């Protein structure tokens, strides 16, 4: 899959992440903490209008994990949810509003926002939904029109 940590990433220095690695993260105020184990399935940037709106930024930096590798370790009672579509179950802290992660049931993956787990060296490998971009990024990474074919997208690569 484009963006997987096993694929060489140009212009970056990916850290070796073993299957036994554990990383912790938290929301903005620290009321909700999470732990991820193993290694992410992929890392990259999403340019879709939904992610841009949710993140209040021009692009979302994602790390995708198998759901069983993501655990809320503290503050589950402060975990709010917002589901705009069936494709994304967004989770946030009800105390500070900090965005934590999004479950993507159609992909069978959980997106833990890269900034939420700072000890994981962010090594992006792909741009998704680049046809919706508002911020052109010339970084040599593949730019997909939508999603990889193995996740139900077209897999079409578009120019930088």
Question: What does each model-identified segment do?
Answer:
Residues 8-160:
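A short Gly-Trp-Pro
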């Amino acid at each position: 899959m484009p963006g997987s940590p096993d694929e060489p990433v140009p212009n970056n220095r990916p850290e070796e992440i073993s299957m036994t690695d554990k990383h912790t993260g938290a929301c903005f105020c620290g009321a909700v903490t999470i732990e991820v184990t193993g290694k992410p399935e992929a890392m990259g940037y999403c340019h879709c209008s939904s992610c841009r709106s949710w993140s209040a930024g021009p692009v979302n930096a994602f790390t995708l994990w198998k759901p069983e590798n993501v655990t809320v370790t503290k503050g589950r009672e402060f975990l709010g949810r917002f589901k705009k579509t069936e494709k994304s179950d967004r989770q946030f802290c009800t105390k500070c509003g900090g965005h934590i992660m999004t479950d993507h049931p159609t992909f069978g993956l959980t997106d833990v926002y890269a900034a939420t787990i700072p000890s994981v060296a962010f090594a992006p490998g792909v741009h998704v939904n680049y046809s919706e971009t508002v911020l052109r990024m010339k970084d040599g990474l593949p730019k997909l029109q939508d999603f990889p074919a193995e996740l139900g997208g077209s897999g079409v690569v578009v120019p930088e």
